[in-house]
Amino acid sequence: MTPTPDAPAAADAATGAGWLARRRGALARVALAPIAQAIGRVERVADGIAFVSGLEDTMLNEVLRFEGGVTGFAHTLDEDLISVVLLDPDAGVRAQTAVARTGAVLEVPAGPQLLGRVVDPLGRPLDGGAPLDAAHTLPIERAAPAIIERDLVSEPLDTGVLIVDALFTIGRGQRELIIGDRATGKTSLAIDAIVNQRHSDVICVYVAIGQRASAVRRVIDAVRRYGAPERCVFVVAPAACAPGLQWIAPFAGFSIAEYFRDRGQHALVVVDDLTKHAATHRELALLTREPPGREAYPGDIFYVHARLLERAAKLSAALGGGSLSALPIAETDAGNLAAYIPTNLISITDGQIVLDSALFAANQRPAVDVGLSVSRVGGKAQHPALRAASGRLRLDYAQFLELEAFTRFGGLTDARLRAQITRGERIRALITQPRFRALRTLDEVVLLKALAAGTLDAMSPDLVAPLRERLPAWLDARIAALTPALAPPRDWLADDAALDALAESVGELIERIAADAARRATAGMPAEDAAGDIGGAFGGEQARGDADRDADHGANREVSREVSPEASREVSREVSREVSHEADRDAAADAARVAGRAPGRAEPDRAVPRAMPDGPPRAQADGDRASASRPPPDARGDAARTAPSPQGGADANVNADANVDAEAEARHKR
């Protein structure tokens, strides 16, 4: 049954009064003012820069849309022209092309949907996945936290690299610069830090600026293989993309990381690298006719990098206590740290890790220069147990480097100095660490305690690599044996007595490794197989092939380091004694050579020595025997040079002369 309308409604429907009132209300809500949109025109375009006129009210960094769909952002604002940096290929952008404002600044999508994805600086997928949900976006240019909003950096950001965690600790919220020449392992060190966060609560953002596509692919594959890609975001602006995308890439990466920091989480940003970003900024500045300064960089290059890196901070507890750490990478030219961009970045950041090309060539990885590297947070963010265990590590290693330089003048007979050199060789073997072989904080503390106790002094440096590989499983087994059943979790790093016991047990592990290595050597098996078998016996881990495993622990490098005056004087006395002994032996050798020749006899031609009946030339044979088994320095003398020869007096003279030449060549090499 259809309901009957009431009387007033029926009357309105009959007269049309209600309809007229509704129409009048709708008309009152209509905006009758004209809607005008400013349209600009392209005056000229070249090299990814468009100069636009007619848009005087444009904001800095505002997104402009060209006819045909190409976008760009306002880079510089002049009275007559606006310099617009294109974010897409400039195909279709010509003179007199229409340009419209959007009223929005550059933004990038942010949120958990980015985790595990590879995107460009605008958030567009590069991995072939689905487009990202742009429900939550952040501007790429954001103000750095104020001083009152920050907290002290007091928590460590573990990298798993012993030399970094022990000597140059990085804290959560710190900015630590990684700087060095080309191909010295800068990216490798940063990727090791990312990979080590696979068991932590840190979100990692890797920003590639101007890198080769193949190099970026290797980085992504390494993180996917060894790390936790589901906790990483890759922002890629390769060398082939537009300069505008390369310029905004680090800002976009920081905005993505700030999303997690502002929600009480911890984030790490690796910018690879800021040297290429500075070159891109210089390119854009020169194209937009900005006045150049030092090394042709514009005057605001310091401000650009400062406002970027100041966004890394540890927030106060009132704001959630989140942190944003930064590992910017910079490249030097021939180790010149005094160049413009390196000095700027060193002054902006909270420390630097300097990688040396000579150490890298000597196969020391990571090639960290201990004398030039520093962390301005350091022990404030270091774990107390690790800080106590690494107290004298840097001083001992610096003194070893100077003593090692002295040993080139001759051997040292002082037992204390030899022990110090032995300790330094073990330190160098410990800090030489292959890629993707991260150590836990417990492993680092136990290794350093064993080093300080002298447990590692008696072992060969070649056994340090298998010791480092097998130590985690060894410690886990010891901890399991010391932990009662159903016992609550225990903080082993807070128990000094337990740490000392674990460090003492390292000696037993060293004995087993040495015995197994000796057995393998007797059987003629290569060292790599021995290390792999040791891993199977003690750690249950698979031996992983890596070229960095065979690091040369005996590489020498002269470095000027600070050493105590007493040690310097003692080393000088030792060197003087060795030099005087060498001079005495040289004089005796010359006298013996003169006495061994007949007066007036012409010196035989050493270029064509007399050949033995059934073998190589006698001089070569004697030289080989002398180099194969050379007597000690005190036993060398006239007897070694005047040994009887079955060939007679002439052959004796030839043999003596050959031995003297071998002696002189050996001394020259020393």
Curated annotation (Swiss-Prot):
Residues 525-670 are annotated as: Disordered. It is an enzyme of class 7 (translocase). Residues 543-588, 621-639 have a biased composition (Basic and acidic residues). GO terms for molecular function: ADP binding; ATP binding; proton-transporting ATP synthase activity, rotational mechanism. One of its GO terms (cellular component) is proton-transporting ATP synthase complex. Residues 589-599, 650-661 have a biased composition (Low complexity). Its main location: membrane. Produces ATP from ADP in the presence of a proton gradient across the membrane. The alpha chain is a regulatory subunit. F-type ATPases have 2 components, CF(1) - the catalytic core - and CF(0) - the membrane proton channel. CF(1) has five subunits: alpha(3), beta(3), gamma(1), delta(1), epsilon(1). CF(0) has three main subunits: a(1), b(2) and c(9-12). The alpha and beta chains form an alternating ring which encloses part of the gamma chain. CF(1) is attached to CF(0) by a central stalk formed by the gamma and epsilon chains, while a peripheral stalk is formed by the delta and b chains. Belongs to the ATPase alpha/beta chains family. This is ATP synthase subunit alpha 2. The lineage of its organism: Bacteria, Pseudomonadati, Pseudomonadota, Betaproteobacteria, Burkholderiales.
